[in-house]
Amino acid sequence: MEQLEPTLLGPQLEPLGMKLDQIMQQQGFEAADMSRRIKLLHAGKRPIDANIFSVVSRATFERHQIALTHFNRSSSKTIQRTVSPIEIVLYRGNWYLNAWCHLREDLRRFSIDAISTAESKSEAAIEISEEEVATKLGQGYGIFSGTNVDTAVLQFSKERAEWVQNEVWHPDQVGVLKPNGAYTLEVPYADERELIADLLKYGHTVEVIRPASLRSSMKRALEAALRLYT
């Protein structure tokens, strides 16, 4: 747990850490030795303010609304708003807050490292059903949310298929290993940005078959990258 985020193990998480230590000791393991033997490596991890995380996590657990200031990287705007926290998400080494935004009157996902101020309010948080949260925030690939879901059909070369066929990109994915060794993967997505960014690292070993809009976006991204080297 210390390796997840050492500065964030405040009063809310310390009891959990102590309980895990007790369980390991009962099994004959020393917690200190376990920490030395297990390493968690994070690439692209963004640091967050421990005080901000403490306020957000405590309000989430205690079911209070939060007044926060958040920087939207897509619009480059900083906006103050009140939210009803629902859950905290750790995704690829970074922390996010799923919440009901009282300003937009809709579900939103906030990167906690982009929150500059946070204050727990006395008002009780609005409760949103798990089904509604999953429908709004959890249908597509990656961290970006949306309800307008399409399906990406991707074909990986034989050399790349050895790895990709054993990976889970989405709970509803469909994968088929072809006789020639290539691997076709169908993945639901609601926002193409993260999917394209991930596909670019595979270079010539992956092809977007459809939809045409995603294929065109991928082509433009590859052409833009190529121009940097010509």
Q: Where do the language-model regions lie?
A:
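A structural signal for short hydrophobic beta-strand segments in well-ordered beta-sheet cores
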Residues: I88, A118, G175-V176
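Loop-centered beta-sheet repeat module
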Residues: S57-Y96, W100-C101
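Well-ordered beta-strand positions in beta-sheet-rich domains
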Residues: Q80-T82, R109-I112, T151-V153, T184-E186
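Flexible linker/loop signature enriched in Pro/Ser/Thr and Pro/Gly
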Residues: L103-K136
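Bulky hydrophobic/aromatic content
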Residues: M1-F71
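Polybasic (Lys/Arg-rich)
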Residues: G138-T230
